């Protein structure tokens, strides 16, 4: 039995590797005109990721879109942070969903070298005040795994209160998040994050393996792929069926694959 399981795992890994090869060996060149350049975590190569200062720098660098990550606190506030805990990016520790906003505001963000800065974790409201419709906001709700209960409703409430729905798109790896948002408001602009699609079969990898069909994701506007996993044929197929595509995350303009794309998510929007 163990040998059978091992064989299946090896088969899946080999199949996934073959699928990724399409993107790795795709023709490369300078970025195509019309691509939406998105500052990943605000433009993380320009400052402390997901900080207000970083977002401002990303906008100043010409990013047409700013990407952020959000989590919900124990007192139902929405804060902007990539990780579910404070440990990596701040001077504090602890899970965000177990802390109040007041507790979170007691800690400072760290720079890329691990040194404390004067920057604080911002709230979603502060980010909306900063962007104010000057760029698109690409907002990622992280995979829930029992955390972030009620985050969809609270995010939607804040976006409506701040008249931000018109310039906000929400993305997630988690189908349950996307499905919940669509049920709350079918007019929301929603995008599906994924690592890639297995070659030759209707299976995608988004942290889990699941069946892919255009019918299942009919409410999705765009599929956002790991940059080495989207090849020409798949991109053309998705566009033919009415979807857009973005790729994440890389910082070298000359490595942009020469395939049909709608956007690039990068830590260095200033280089594009």
Predicted regions located by residue number:
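Phosphate-group recognition and catalysis centered on beta-loop-alpha active-site segments
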Residues: 2-272
């Amino acid at each position: 039995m163990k040998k059978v399981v091992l064989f299946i795992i090896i088969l899946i890994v080999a199949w996934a590797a073959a699928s990724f090869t399409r993107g790795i060996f795709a023709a490369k060149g300078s970025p195509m005109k019309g691509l939406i350049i998105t500052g990943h975590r605000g433009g993380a190569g320009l400052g402390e990721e997901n900080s207000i200062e970083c977002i401002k720098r990303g906008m100043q660098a010409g990013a047409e879109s700013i990407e952020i990550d959000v989590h919900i606190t124990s007192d139902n506030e929405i804060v902007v942070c990539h990780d579910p805990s404070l440990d990596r990016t701040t001077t504090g520790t602890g899970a965000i969903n177990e802390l109040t906003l007041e507790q979170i505001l007691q800690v400072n963000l760290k720079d890329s070298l691990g040194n404390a800065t004067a920057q604080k974790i911002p709230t979603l409201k502060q980010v909306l005040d900063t962007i104010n419709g000057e760029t698109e906001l690409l907002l990622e709700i992280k995979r829930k795994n029992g955390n972030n209960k009620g985050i969809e409703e609270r995010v939607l409430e804040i976006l409506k209160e701040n008249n931000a729905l018109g310039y906000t798109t929400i993305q997630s790896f988690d189908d349950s998040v996307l499905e919940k948002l669509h049920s709350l408001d079918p007019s929301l602009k929603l995008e599906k994050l994924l690592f890639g699609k297995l070659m030759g079969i209707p299976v995608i990898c988004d942290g889990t393996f699941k069946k892919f069909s255009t019918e299942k994701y009919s409410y999705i506007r765009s599929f956002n792929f790991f940059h080495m996993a989207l090849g020409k044929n798949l991109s053309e197929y998705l566009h033919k069926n009415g979807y857009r595509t973005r790729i994440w995350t890389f910082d070298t303009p000359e490595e942009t694959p020469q395939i049909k794309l709608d956007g690039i998510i990068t830590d260095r929007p200033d280089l594009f």
